[in-house]
Amino acid sequence: MGNNVAETQIKPFTMNFGPQHPAAHGVLRLVLEMDGEVVQRADPHVGLLHRGTEKLIEYKTYIQALPYFDRLDYVSPMSQEHAFALATEKLLGITVPVRGQYIRVLFSEITRILNHLLNITTFGLDVGAITPSLWGFEEREKLMAFYERVSGARMHANYFRPGGVNLDMPAGLADDIWEYTERFPKFVADLNNLLTENRIFKQRTVDIGVVSRADALAWGFSGPMIRGSGVPWDLRKAQPYDRYDEFDFDIPVGSTGDCYARYLVRMEEMRQSNRLIRQALEKLAKTPGPVKVNDRKIAPPPRGEMKRSMESLIHHFKLYTEGYHVPAGETYTAVESPKGEFGVYLVSDGTNRPYRCKIRPTGFSHLQAMDFMSKGHMLADTVAIIGSMDIVFGEIDR
């Protein structure tokens, strides 16, 4: 009798999470192996937003290549422009005027707040808190207005340029940003009241996706992901660029390495960015002068000068048709973007186009740990883990 009973073999259930899923944060496709509702294995499939950015850049001049960086992590555009501009400046051997550097710091920190506002509020939405996302988008709108006033675009700014920034800030903008920084701490406090001690939010995030200090280093984490695990690593302090060493700010560090710790790190980073913005505005008020290098072979002449000088008109025409030639060489330049270390490995062969531009996206290193972080958690917890990673597929797929 016993011999006739077929042995039952229990196999894990395979399911697709995304790419059309509200919590996938873009076009993430996860192939999950489930034991009931517990994740045994998570296999992220990337490439659905691949546009060949690195190859396209090889066919563009250095000026034409810069706008591609806005379209990578499209919720924090100016940070990536910053990395490419610094890399090109390093190869050219030029130094940006002090006022231009302060404007870059100012808008890098506005970008950090823009990014964290979106991440924290949509992270709340992922785990069931709807109100923060409605508040967050309203607040981001005010910051996007600053983007628009300085560059003409709300998202794809194309404002940072090798040699400085495109134009100086328009009259009245500094006062409006200062006024915003006075109101912003109240908004952060309100957001803090909604989420930080919220019982349901803590149940969904505490002890979920725990990454130890050693594991965070081994997986190549950076930004809030590594700081949430207790490693005080921030390129603005460790390898200062564009006068960050003149600014006074703290690096928030978590202790538990879970989703909740990463949330707290981002909350405090918004407060620190507000401090940095105020310091940058104070320094700008005392620092008149040019915002880009006075080299007509690299930076285009002012419009008024082009109407008076034939030489300026020729420079402008040559810059926007042929571009400038960058001396042969290579450099790896990284900035502390809102998501972590965003790096550009730029190789020049002495022509007017990059020979190779390798982009080190921040989210790629974080997403590769998805299997490690979600193993043994419930299906609903993978949503919280993805939200705490702050991934955007524009930069991961490139």
Swiss-Prot record:
Listed SUPFAM superfamilies: HydB/Nqo4-like
Catalytic activity reported: a quinone + NADH + 5 H(+)(in) = a quinol + NAD(+) + 4 H(+)(out)
InterPro entries (alphabetical): NADH_Q_OxRdtase_suD (IPR001135), NADH_UbQ_OxRdtase_49kDa_CS (IPR014029), NDH1_su_D/H (IPR022885), NiFe-Hase_large (IPR029014)
Annotated keywords: Cell inner membrane, Cell membrane, Membrane, NAD, Quinone, Translocase, Transport, Ubiquinone
EC number: 7.1.1.-
Gene Ontology MF term list: NAD binding; NADH:ubiquinone reductase (non-electrogenic) activity; quinone binding
Endpoints of the signal sequence: none
Membrane-topology descriptor: Peripheral membrane protein
Cell compartments where the protein resides: Cell inner membrane
Any matching Pfam family: Complex1_49kDa
Principal EC category: translocase
Primary subcellular site in the record, as a coarse category: membrane
GO cellular component: plasma membrane
PANTHER family xrefs: NADH DEHYDROGENASE [UBIQUINONE] IRON-SULFUR PROTEIN 2, MITOCHONDRIAL, NADH-UBIQUINONE OXIDOREDUCTASE 49 KDA SUBUNIT
Function: NDH-1 shuttles electrons from NADH, via FMN and iron-sulfur (Fe-S) centers, to quinones in the respiratory chain. The immediate electron acceptor for the enzyme in this species is believed to be ubiquinone. Couples the redox reaction to proton translocation (for every two electrons transferred, four hydrogen ions are translocated across the cytoplasmic membrane), and thus conserves the redox energy in a proton gradient.
Complex and partners: NDH-1 is composed of 14 different subunits. Subunits NuoB, C, D, E, F, and G constitute the peripheral sector of the complex.
Family stated for the protein in its record: Belongs to the complex I 49 kDa subunit family.
Name of the protein: NADH-quinone oxidoreductase subunit D
Gene source species: Rhodospirillum centenum (strain ATCC 51521 / SW)
Gene it is expressed from: nuoD
